[in-house]
Amino acid sequence: MSKEQKTFYLTTPIYYPSDKLHIGHAYTTVAGDAMARYKRLRGYNVMYLTGTDEHGQKIEQKAEAKGLTPKQFVDEIVSGIQDLWKKLDISYDDFIRTTEERHIKVVQQIFEQLLDQGDIYLGDYEGWYSIPDETFYTETQLVDKEYDADGNLIGGKSPDSGHPVEKVREQSYFFRMSKYADRLLQFYEENPQFIQPESRKNEMINNFIKPGLEDLAVSRTSFTWGVPVPRDPKHVVYVWIDALSNYITALGYGSDQQEKYENYWPADVHLVGKEIVRFHTIYWPIMLMALDLPLPKKVFGHGWLLMKDGKMSKSKGNVVDPVPLIDRYGLDALRYYLLREVPFGSDGVFTPEAFVERVNYDLANDLGNLLNRTVAMIEKYFDGKIPSYVKDGTPFDADLVELVYSTVKKVEDAMEEMEFSIALTAIGQLISRTNKYIDETQPWVLAKDESKREQLGAAMYHLAESIRYVSVLLQPFMTKAPQKIWEQLGIDSSLTTWESLETFGQIPGNTNVQKGQPLFPRLDVEEEVAHIKSLMGGSKKPEEAPKDEKEESDEITIDDFSKVELRIAEVIDAEPVKKADRLLKIQLDLGYEKRQVVSGIAKYYSPSDLIGKKVICVTNLKPVKLRGELSQGMILAGSEGDQLRLATVDGALPNGSLVK
């Protein structure tokens, strides 16, 4: 590595191999992979680390139940995890296992150092413990508490996962967390970008640090599957020191070969789920302070990928296995959905309907159809050879090129903030604009007039070159489709670099195109939604709720009103419904998905009047068909006499925002 080359060190959490991983784990790792691929495209020397946290009581118990040693148990699951990452095209640079000697040896060194300098001491622990979470909780942190007849607390649940806790008492080594609380707060103030999104920082300060940090139990004696404490082998090093230190042990810290550590540490970003932000922004920084090591530059706590009935969880059995989705719909479809559907810092809901819509609307209709039409027209009008570049050959070229350049900037800005959905939205807007360019230039009309031959050539070139830009911008997110696009456009690797985006007009004239298979075949919505639901175990119908026999009232309660889900939506397309003078078919962007609504407003608005308006949509209405068109909601409007106006929203609230 040259000294001038910038480095970028990115990590996922190390996953707990108590069972197969699900699509929620894939979400984190695919996001990290997109970031790693982007940084490599920008010329960085990237270290992308993932791995497995393999010790603990839960694994010890599961292995015993299966008649296996803990190591045999985790070896089998870890092999499956590595197979999954291969199937997802995860381009990790190292995979750390906490059962590896390179890790165990350094964990013991760290524990001994902290013990010798007085940051760890021996004491007794009594408190509440969740085995699945491998986490201790104070009485005040528990939820759903249970009391006996005398008012004594006898149980409760983890505030992070809802798992039950049990009372434990055992001897333990403790880490003096409280000693570093003020220093940690000062670090937060001096490094405002350390915890992202911002809301996570406020949660850490108000919920954990200001109430007073308690010293942390860092060893256990109630199980043996862990790293032994060197001077007291009846204790095993607990997860906080064992698991968190993987970020430096994987780099060779504490070993004879520290070159990677010196090159890459401190980490540029730790990617974690929001439920473990506390461990990475309080426990880990304090541990590093005690070791007198630099702190990571950023911890990004992303949201959860939820099911309609709540958090996806192995213990609940409501998980989605990504493998059947990849096998049926292709890797790129799944990677695109995961990164486009949900803003990375927010929670999102996985639904079969949204998945199929993303594939059909964004990938098959918009991207796939654009490539197919472009290649077909170049074959038809120019014998399969891309014409030479002519600047401003049509009146629409300048606007398209301007959007091409601005899209590159939008993607770069979004990626620096890990705003994957915003980056993909910008690319999607360029795809839509390029499709519109076909309608504006009307190549089929130009082809009929020999005097318009140069304009026709300019249109074909601008289409091909714009698609090239799209393909390069998609590389961090999709690992298969860009290569297929390059093959159809006949472009070589020199035109697939990020540097090639600096100047429009790079494809040489006379480049041969070659039509290929559709990038993304269009899916049968009803059939594929049903198939995905069957994979999710969703074929069972919920029992009908008992009907309320009370007489209806003109008044409603706040509970009644709260059942109505109102969200801000942007109109992205509209057209009349055939043989229905009053109806318009309207396409809405809700941020997390696109929907179609049929509305009786044709008398008051033309389709072009609606494009770009921010409207309020009722999003939890049961879908219905009106004149054969599916309507998935209702947009709000006010009326008096023969006047009607849509309820619109001012300001910059994002699509999908709840109206309260």
UniProtKB/Swiss-Prot annotation:
Coarse class of the protein's main subcellular location: cytoplasm
Q: Where is this motif: 'KMSKS' region?
A: 311-315
Where is the motif ('HIGH' region)? 15-25
- GO biological process assignments: methionyl-tRNA aminoacylation
Return the InterPro entries for the record.
aa-tRNA-synth_I_CS, Anticodon_Met, M/V/L/I-tRNA-synth_anticd-bd, Met-tRNA-synth_bsu_C, Met-tRNA_synth, Met-tRNA_synth_2, Methionyl/Leucyl_tRNA_Synth, MetRS_core
The record's Gene3D superfamilies line, in alphabetical order, gives:
2.170.220.10, HUPs, Isoleucyl-tRNA Synthetase, Domain 1, Nucleic acid-binding proteins
Biased region (Basic and acidic residues) positions are 540-550
What does it catalyze? tRNA(Met) + L-methionine + ATP = L-methionyl-tRNA(Met) + AMP + diphosphate
- Ranges where the record places region Disordered: 535-554
- Cite the entry's keywords alphabetically: Aminoacyl-tRNA synthetase, ATP-binding, Cytoplasm, Ligase, Nucleotide-binding, Protein biosynthesis, RNA-binding, tRNA-binding
Query: Which is one GO molecular function term here?
Result: tRNA binding
Q: Where in the cell is it found?
A: Cytoplasm
Does this entry carry the keyword RNA-binding? yes
Q: Does the keyword Translocase apply?
A: no
What job does this protein perform? Is required not only for elongation of protein synthesis but also for the initiation of all mRNA translation through initiator tRNA(fMet) aminoacylation.
- Kindly give the NCBIfam families that the UniProt entry links to this protein: metG, metG_C_term, PRK12267.1
The entry's protein name is Methionine--tRNA ligase
Where does this protein come from, organism-wise? Halalkalibacterium halodurans (strain ATCC BAA-125 / DSM 18197 / FERM 7344 / JCM 9153 / C-125)
Gene that produces this protein = metG
